[in-house]
């Protein structure tokens, strides 16, 4: 596997879609949708999902990645992505909880305006992700193994990402459980500026899986 070509492909597949949606940004905002829209989010999420599976396959790890918007049997929460034991053959994108290795929250843009709802970063993060972390901790007790809850955003405001990363690392009890590709403010200006290089994504994934 040529890592550089995969990293370039990840960006090259997504950036043209961002530019296309950016040209229609006004229309999307008129419809009260976030910049990027669900369409763009789906394109990026599918690309990221394939990117993760390619890394897993290259290193012969015994895991598979669910399709987007998957469920864990007996759990009411819809997860953006689930990484599970490769031997499992899930039905209807529903995963056996005993086979789950990690769950992932994916955001096209991880930038949030704190003043919009007059909440602090900490309050927003707890209200947004607290229930999911409680669910993960409950599942861990039932299946008797660690399940990490990871966060990935394609673009983000740097300050917001730092707060998000600190929150996820604290609740996972380990470092490096959140990852951001691009600077959201620069992306709005049409500039492609990395927050963390694509090469660092492998380290993030291995850490999430406990395979460092």
Question: What does each of the following model-derived ranges do?
Answer:
Residues 1-212:
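Intrinsically disordered, low-complexity Ser/Thr/Pro/Gly-rich regulatory segments
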């Amino acid at each position: 596997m040529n890592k550089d070509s995969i990293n370039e492909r990840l960006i090259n597949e997504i950036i043209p879609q961002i530019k296309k949606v950016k040209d229609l940004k006004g229309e999307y905002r008129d419809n009260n949708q976030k910049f990027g829209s669900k369409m763009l989010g789906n394109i990026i999420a599918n690309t990221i999902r394939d990117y993760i599976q390619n890394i897993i396959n290259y290193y012969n790890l015994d895991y598979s990645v669910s399709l987007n918007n998957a469920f864990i049997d007996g759990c009411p929460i819809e997860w953006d992505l689930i990484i599970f034991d490769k031997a499992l053959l899930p039905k209807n994108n529903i995963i056996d909880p005993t086979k789950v290795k990690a769950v992932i929250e994916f955001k096209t843009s991880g930038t949030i305006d704190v003043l919009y709802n007059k909440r602090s970063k900490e309050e927003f993060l707890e209200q947004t992700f607290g229930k999911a972390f409680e669910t993960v901790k409950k599942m861990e007790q039932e299946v008797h193994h660690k399940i990490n809850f990871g966060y990935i955003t394609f673009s983000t405001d740097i300050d917001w990402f730092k707060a998000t990363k600190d929150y996820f690392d604290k609740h996972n009890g380990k470092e490096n459980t959140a990852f951001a590709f691009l600077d959201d403010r620069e992306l709005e200006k049409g500039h492609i500026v990395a927050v963390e290089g694509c090469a660092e994504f492998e380290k993030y994934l291995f850490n999430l899986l406990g395979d460092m």
